[in-house]
Structures are given as structure tokens and as C-alpha cells.
Curated annotation (Swiss-Prot):
Protein name in UniProt: Ribonuclease HII
GO biological process entries: DNA replication, removal of RNA primer; mismatch repair
Lineage: Bacteria, Pseudomonadati, Pseudomonadota, Gammaproteobacteria, Legionellales
InterPro entries: RNase_HII, RNase_HII/HIII, RNase_HII/HIII_dom, RNaseH-like_sf, RNaseH_sf
Main function: Endonuclease that specifically degrades the RNA of RNA-DNA hybrids.
Compartments, record wording: Cytoplasm
UniProt binding sites for a divalent metal cation: 13-14, 103
Amino acid sequence: MNTELKILMAGVDEVGRGPLAGAVVTAAVILKKPIDGLTDSKKLSPKQRNLLAIRIKEEALAFAYGRAEVEEIDQLNIHHATLLAMRRAVEALPIQPDNVVVDGAFTPQLNIPCKAIVQGDSLVPEISAASILAKVLRDEEMVALDKIYPGYGFAEHKGYATPVHKEALMRLGPCRIHRRSYSPVADLISK
């Protein structure tokens, strides 16, 4: 009989703190075993991310998503909204982890041990996997929102403050998914 206990660790990361539009999306992942190629999602091409996301979903012991919508970001601020989204991802896991590691310097309030690791998305495979899943999901959502709100270019810049996005914002004004608490959206509304 095997008496060795397996400690279940969930990695958590977010995507979408900086954009002017769209939700902040988080993922929590518990891996069964290491997956080759995992790293910070920003270091991967879209094709690499998509292929790894498929493998993560197939091979992970468990994964779940969390999010904070634009209204929550504007009401709470991005820091607190991100921590809320992280908590939601962990709470949505079908398996309760023994501990949680989070990319960054802050941890969400959880009823289980949680540790923040700066640059964890490059150092901890579970956080890397969460980074990839969150990035792929948010990018897919922004492509879909581009069809609902044409003219802003969400499919290309994913809501970030690119020159194209800022120009569209000046021309069209903000739409429902713009973060009213963010400059230049707030500046435009106040004029």
C-alpha cells in the first residue's frame, strides 16, 4: 500500500490588468505531472499558447477560471478586482488544493495556504499553465467582443492602449466594455 501523500498545489495567474477594455481573467491549475514547454504566456506565440492550452486542459488534474467584469474593476479598482478573480478561480476548482501559489506580490484571501511568487509565471509550472489558460481565454473573448463592438480593433490589440485603440476611442467614444476608471477613458468621459 502506498502511504505517500501527494500535495496538491494550484497555480494561479491573471491576464488583463492593463487593458482599457474587457474583464480581468484568471485561471487556477493543478498539474498531475510537468508539461514540456510551460512558461510565461507572454513569452509564447499565439500558436504555441493555443497548443499548450489544449495539452493543459487534457493533462491537468484540474483547472478553473475566474474573472472580474469591467463594472467590478471600476468599482473595486484593478488590484482588488484581480484578487477577487483569483479567489473565484481557486474556488471554482473541482478539487480542493492543499496550497496555492500566485504570480505576483499579492495573494487573494483564501481558506488555504497561499504564497505569492514574483515572476512565478516563469518559475512555477502550475502558474505558467494558469497564465497560458487565462491568456488564451481572454484573447478569445476579445476577438468575440470585436464583432459585438466593431471599430475599436479589440481582435488585434485585445483592449490594450495602442495608438489604434486610442484613436478609435476618440472617434467612437467608449463602449460598454471600456473601463471608465482608466485613463484615457476617464479623461474622454470628463470632457
